[in-house]
Amino acid sequence: MYDEIGRLLVIGLVLSAILLFIAFYIGHTRLQKNAAFASYASRVMDFFYKPLLAVYMFFYKNPDKLHKKMADLKNNAQRKKFSKTKTRIVLAPHCMRHVECKARTTRTGIQCTSCGKCDFAELKKMSEEHGYKLYIITGSSFVKHILKHPDAKGTDGVLAIGCNYEINKGMRELKRSKIMTYGVPLLSAGCYNTHIDLEEFERQLIHLEGLNGSKS
């Protein structure tokens, strides 16, 4: 009995190693641009997230490379499907707001007044010009309130802004809701006064529109 259990464990470890190797191979080659392969690699890396995290911490002392790779794979896997969504919103982190921000907070996040002290005024303008509604959240608990709100009714696409860790985490969680996601990373991680490359953000919006042949 114990011999059989031992053999099963060995087989399981070997299969796991093979799956991880395939996922890493896809993640580090041109295959990651292929949606089907990227989707496969993303699922495998999600399943083995904790051991992968331990490996990255051991070799790199910083898991950001892992989170970036996982977020990039999810983007490549979902980009085309995201471009076909009809009702899209942008979720942005409160760490981008100015330290002196006086905007009030409701159940759907911080209500930006476009004062111009941080990136949100321009980000809000860009988002609305391309058919997105911007929501500034202080935590993941706000997402469920936003998706239930009348203003976000029928949302089938979420463009998430944040650090690579939060983007990867958010995309993984929203996948359970059958909502297509796409992530755009901040220029740097942090708890306050963070920024996004606004030109790159708009390029991404235009690119996503181009994939579907029209503006949302």
Residue ranges, per PLM feature:
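N-terminal, charge-rich interaction modules
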Residues: Y2-A121
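Cytosol-/stroma-facing membrane-proximal "stalk/adaptor" domains immediately downstream
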Residues: Q111, F120, K124-S216
